[in-house]
């Protein structure tokens, strides 16, 4: 599935964010709970993140051009970094509102109705996050994965808030409402930090996942048994695309056509194992001492 096809899932996230903003905002207005307010604020972050995801998926879907020969797939990492940053901002906002309420406790109202509305909003987020996570992992879209993680964080936030507000309702301990909001803020900081780390890794040309790299190495090792050699295997992940390159060493007496035919055969097998891979093969003669020495990943001019 191309990034253009993934955009409909970003629209799903936007629709879910709008629905939960209305529901959680209503729950907060009914109860006056700072915990539910923190939950509602995070839904605004969800909306901003979903809109950013849509924009970056649209950019990532653009074809390669003269200035972007490898396409625009890395645009997705800007979206996930933006989501991570927004999560951290939401955590700070929640903590600020909670600390203020801690020193100025307020009684809660219409708690039963407010909690019921919040539960409905949480179910919407849970279903949406499961859909986005499945699609994101299947098609290697860090944008959709980031959005799914964000929504799942929101679900756990809501669970904590609902439980806490319920306890306040039962016990009358007003201080518990802001304390729960502070704990929620501390919890979601971790998710935001993880998203920022993954985004930075992608922008720094991180290698493809270990299981895919192992599959490629297994294929190349099988061809070694047929008399071929390989070195300088390089991989990198760029959004939904994986880029793979290696040097294929063949007998020097082979014709270019014969070497090319073997190269095509190997590349086709790699694509069957890693369907989203873009592969570049460099042919070298086995007998050439320069070829034997040419194994450094960062070869410099002599």
Task: Kindly give the residue locations of the regions a language model identified.
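Alpha-helical transmembrane cores and adjacent cytosolic helix/loop segments
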Residues: 1-211
